[in-house]
């Protein structure tokens, strides 16, 4: 098995989204997935039993409500455990990496950044597409993007393991020996890349609300890092409205999937 790029996530009770998320990222060339299961009611190791057995997925169980640094500590732990990989992406289950140029393999993109410590990809936020209820496919069902939303300045990073120092300050930004750049090689010194780069090389589709039903469950569940009531309050009606006030249809990820299917 190739060991060039892995992705790590932390989640709780988001099992239903994992198959599509893993299948998609496997199709674009991700070699391994390291998942922190934060006390899910149905263990993720059961949901992904086949993927765990064939070595595609590693699940580590963690328990209980954490503090504000829980996600950062888990990210650091994942990178340190995955040093046989050149790159580790630190994402969430509602984030999908989109390749915007000709290649359908993420390895072709990451090889361009091997002298740097990390590459930061901007979010492009997506809303609910008017869906009240859960949909079978996130990728095919949610095409309502929000390109003008100020939160698109946020990045998520792929970090080169040999350059990694820590994620002590922010889950959106890694401290590295060789620094972080955006996809155009501009220097990034914090959790934002502004103006965001949304139309070339790589970005992250962030399906922040999914449907109204998904969103209401998210409000009850709280964040995947288990920070409890303190952070559940951020998922308000106004939060939902903020990510559903634009309707710019974006099909980039669907077109990428079609290119992959045509190659196979």
Where are these regions (language model features)?
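N-proximal low-complexity "stem/linker" segments adjacent to membrane-targeting elements
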Residues: 1-23
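Short, acidic, metal-binding catalytic loop of nucleotide-sugar glycosyltransferases
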Residues: 23-32
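Catalytic-site signature of metal-activated, phosphate-bearing donor transferases
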Residues: 72-73, 99-264
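Short beta-strand/loop segment that forms part of the nucleotide-sugar
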Residues: 31-39, 60-64
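Short acidic/polar active-site loop segments enriched in Thr and Asp
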Residues: 31, 86, 117
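Active-site-proximal specificity loops/subdomain of glycosyltransferases
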Residues: 43-90, 98-99
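Ser/Thr-glycine-rich phosphate-binding loops at phosphate-binding pockets of nucleotides
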Residues: 9, 36-45
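Short acidic donor-binding/metal-coordinating loop in glycosyltransferase active sites
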Residues: 38, 92-96
